[in-house]
Design a protein with these regions (language model features):
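Non-catalytic C-terminal accessory modules of carbohydrate-active enzymes
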Residues: 2-6, 82, 109-113, 118-121, ...
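A general structural signal for short secondary-structure junctions and capping/turn motifs
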Residues: 41-43, 56-59, 74-83, 89-95, ...
Length: 512
């Protein structure tokens, strides 16, 4: 049984597809206070296990740490990090009492699960405007089953998406992709996808192709499809500020970008330099941005991955101005009044600065909503934009789509990958523990960067990562520019890699 409790004036996230009546009174578990923001306090039994929180740090049992659902671009997935890329506010208590809770709140929300006090779970957020769903069941399995029913059917990709994929930030030319295809073919290692990172674009502009490297792109897509390999391009959240660039011009003309309080388009720097963010919470802007995927679909593309959609901010115009002013004062400081640590801190904190997320707004049905109040919905609605567009473009076809940032509800439109991990043994365990927690929240098509995105892998580490990938729906080897080449055929005794990936292909009839 699921009961819905409403506090204040919550923003409609559309996380659920089922309509539930609002319950009266108070939940039968813990204590709730709405006097200064929102807080839920529950005294845990010594034997209680707490599951959930989807893509979050540490173990499957979440006791003993503080987690904050606040979608964050942070490639350093160390044990002390409280936030990663997703916001999945489902917890399940299993023990003396067994129940689940979904805190449908799109801004930052903190879960102190036995950290401050070993026996106390405390959930807090700044504003008392949220929906709380309390799920009662006989077991965690029963609770997950009920929850999955009310949030709607999970995204299922096309069959080829269950095959093996190779990716690297740094593949730049057709020859780079041909070399990868040939390397796998010549070593008799099956492969279904090669991913295109940002270098395929013209100056990192969404829905463009490098004029130098990808002329006759439809023919190149067909060339690889004839080898049973699909190209899967990346799409980033920021639209480059560049007069004459059609996506930019259309967005400015129709006011489809997120704006400052004064109505001007908000400017943040990401890979292309100065960018605007499409206002994907505005249904008209969401439709417009989703329809842009047609540019590549019409050239034969069957899948995409959405990135940088927390949204990541390298710096804002306002933030960089503050850093430059401090740098100017630092340069003139001959008496040591400004400590070097202050300068270093300013440079470090300019990226993804919380102040920047308070500087721009969304237009939602004529209402101006400050971004930080709905921050965790951006990646969800960017991927929703694509998913809804796919239905319009070709309703009979399944497209591959997965995203870095997410919120519960996005599971209906795409899968996720767990972001910029490292070539560390510890991250095999971390990524393994994330998978069941993500499944609880509806994300079935999920996986990690096998081999590790950052740092240099080793032969043994890559093999063990691939062994994990055999059992994750998304099986992709991905690594960063500047790291060791990580394609399976780069290592000795290639037959071991052929065997591991071959096991996956023997499982596909059972997966699909």
């Amino acid at each position: 049984m699921i009961k819905k409790y409403v506090y204040g004036e919550p923003f409609e996230t559309e996380a659920l597809t089922e309509t539930l009546e609002t319950a009266e009174g108070k939940p039968g578990y813990g204590e709730i206070c709405t006097e200064d923001g929102f807080s839920f306090t529950y005294i845990m039994d010594e034997e209680d296990i707490v599951y959930g929180l989807g893509e979050s740090n540490r173990g499957i049992n979440k006791r003993g740490f503080i987690y904050t659902s606040n979608c964050t671009d942070d490639p350093e997935h160390t044990e002390d990090k409280h936030s990663l890329y997703g916001a999945h506010n489902l917890i399940i208590v299993s023990g003396k009492e067994t129940f689940g809770m979904f805190f449908d709140y799109p801004a930052a929300i903190t879960f102190d699960i036995g950290y401050t006090r070993m026996d106390t779970m405390k959930v807090t957020c700044e504003n008392a405007d949220l929906k709380l769903y309390v799920i009662e069941g006989e077991s965690p399995y029963d609770i997950v089953k009920q929850f999955r029913h009310v949030i709607g059917r999970s995204y299922i990709p096309p069959k080829f998406a269950f095959g093996f994929g190779q990716s690297r930030w740094g593949y730049t030319t057709k020859e780079d992709f041909r070399k990868v295809a040939a390397g796998y073919r010549e070593n008799h290692i099956p492969i279904d996808m090669i991913y295109m990172d940002i270098d395929y674009m013209q100056s990192y502009k969404d829905f463009t192709l490098s004029e130098e490297n990808f002329q006759d792109f439809p023919e190149f897509v067909k060339e690889l499809k004839d080898q049973d390999i699909r190209l899967i391009p990346i799409i980033d959240a920021g639209v480059k500020v560049e007069p004459g660039y059609d996506v930019y011009e259309e967005g400015v003309k129709n006011r489809y970008f997120c704006q400052r309080e004064d109505g001007s388009d908000f400017v943040a720097a990401v890979w292309p330099g100065d960018t605007h963010f499409p206002d994907v919470l505005n249904k008209d802007a969401r439709k417009w941005f989703g329809d842009k995927y047609r540019f590549l679909i019409e050239k034969g593309i069957d899948g995409f991955w959405n990135d940088m959609n927390e949204p990541a901010i390298f710096y804002s115009t306002e933030g960089m101005k503050e850093v430059k002013e401090l740098a100017g004062e630092f340069a003139k400081d001959t008496e040591g009044k400004i400590h070097i640590w202050k300068m270093q801190s300013a440079l470090r904190d300019v990226a993804n600065n919380p102040e920047d997320y308070r500087r721009f707004y969304h237009n939602v049905d004529g209402r101006k909503i400050r971004h930080d109040k709905v921050h965790n919905l951006f990646g969800y609605n960017m991927t929703r934009a694509a998913g809804e567009a796919f239905e319009r473009i070709d309703p009979e076809k399944r497209f591959l789509m997965f995203s870095r940032s997410s919120y519960i509800g996005m599971h209906r439109y795409g899968g996720i990958w767990t972001g910029d991990n490292k070539s560390w043994w510890a991250h095999i365990l971390l990524n393994l523990k994330m998978m069941p927690s993500l499944n609880m929240c509806g994300f079935l098509y999920a996986g990690a960067d096998l081999g590790g995105f950052g740092a240099d892998t080793t032969r043994e580490l890559l093999l063990r990562f691939l062994a994990l990938g055999v059992f994750t729906p998304l099986m992709r080897d991905h690594t960063a520019i500047g790291t060791r080449e990580q394609e399976c055929y780069q290592f000795e005794n290639v037959e071991d890699f052929r065997h591991v990936i071959g096991v996956r292909y023997r499982l596909i009839p059972y997966l699909y």
